[in-house]
Curated annotation (Swiss-Prot):
Induction: Up-regulated by methyl jasmonate treatment. Its cofactor is heme. Belongs to the cytochrome P450 family. GO terms for cellular component: endoplasmic reticulum membrane. It comes from Eschscholzia californica. The gene is CYP719A5. GO terms for biological process: isoquinoline alkaloid biosynthetic process. One of its GO terms (molecular function) is (S)-cheilanthifoline synthase activity. This is Cheilanthifoline synthase. Heme binds at residue 432.
Amino acid sequence: MEESLWVVTATVVVVFAIAKLLKKSSSISTMEWPKGPKKLPIIGNLHQLGGEAFHVVLANLAKIHGTVMTIWVGAWRPMIVISDIDKAWEVLVNKSSDYAGRDFPEITKIISANWKNISCSDSGPFWQNLRKGLQGGALAPLNVISQYQLQERDMKNLITSMQEKASKNNGILKPLDYLKEETIRLLSRLIFGQSFNDENFVKGVHLALDDLVRISGYASLADAFKFCENLPSHKKSIREVHEVNERVVNLVKPYLVKNPPTNTYLYFLNSQKFSDEVIISAVLEVYDLGVDSTASTAVWALTFLVREPRVQEKLYKEIIDLTGGERSVKVEDVSKLPYLQAVMKETMRMKPIAPMAIPHKTSRDTSLMGKKVNKGTSIMVNLYAIHHNPKVFPEPYKFIPERFLQGQESKYGDIKEMEQSLLPFSAGMRICAGMELGKLQYGFSLASLVEAFKWTCAVDGKLPDLSEDHCFILLMKNPLEARITPRTQL
């Protein structure tokens, strides 16, 4: 009986898949898809996408099949993967509006009010209005400048907390959680107002974000194979996302006051008469895109500095030369430190926080390299592959901040070409809305921590691990644990 049931189930699955394939075949046959690895029935190229991280696998496949190739996630869900800067520029910049649609797993509807936020919604009046409201209000330059003293206060408190924690653990600690919560505080003031001071909220958002990252790794299989929606593992993921979303609602709802300060994101959201669901989704999005992109990138940078003491001391000297050792580094100093900027860029080159960017979808019939691309075609840009092109970045797997310093071009490559090929925040009309704030907070955090502490291996002679976690964003498999020594004690 059980064997018969298994046969019936398998037959239904195969028939369903073939029916879907036949249904889709008419829509995809009118377009000449770029060549790619040979696909198998039903599963497409899924058998070739395991093992290493997704962006690494695709970068290796591009070396064989070309920098513009088609990958089939399931036999009826093709996507074009671009691993070349010129083609990426055509998609992201030159034909930005043609490729400005989005392609997200169904599960993301739960936390985005049915894709009603900046990152998930297709381009159009709603998207333009929401993006303009964020950038022109909470993230307006003068409003960000008004945060400088509070950022510096937060950093002073963070350094004190880190020193106290490390002193109880033989000088060793993990910096990631400290930097995440520092970023949550900054973003909360921009969303709700400068009077924000709720550590329970900070801890709650931190936990919710960690849970969403953990769950995100299971999100896409059911999009490739709809019958997977009934698998217990997928149902569990759906249930967990609903639970996290409910926790976020309970955290944010008490802050949905009628008259928030005029320079906050909440003021703009209220002015648009959005539902609470859309407002909470927009608030969560700021944390979701802003916290890990800032904190995790700073920790990647610290990891490289532990592994490269020469670079760390060169950066420390630049900071002290600017401050004279008479004061702490300030937020406004970030733009005055060229080697700091080079370290930041080299970290984002080697470890872009979104190595496959956010998936794009064509909003109309268009073209790529002169060939027709149908409306609704999924596009992914492999930023990791672009950032590791040896023709642009000599010795691409080595951490060399000097490549981004003016005057070093002859030794490390064409700096103009390298700058154009560096796309950690994507490019074009869908470039990250919070890019400038993210770079500022990232740079200030990194400079402050290098100024305050000397960072060394937690265990003498054992360099920190650079392994990557296999998820949508580029996190460390084993977050940095390092020994910190206050510079005042050296």
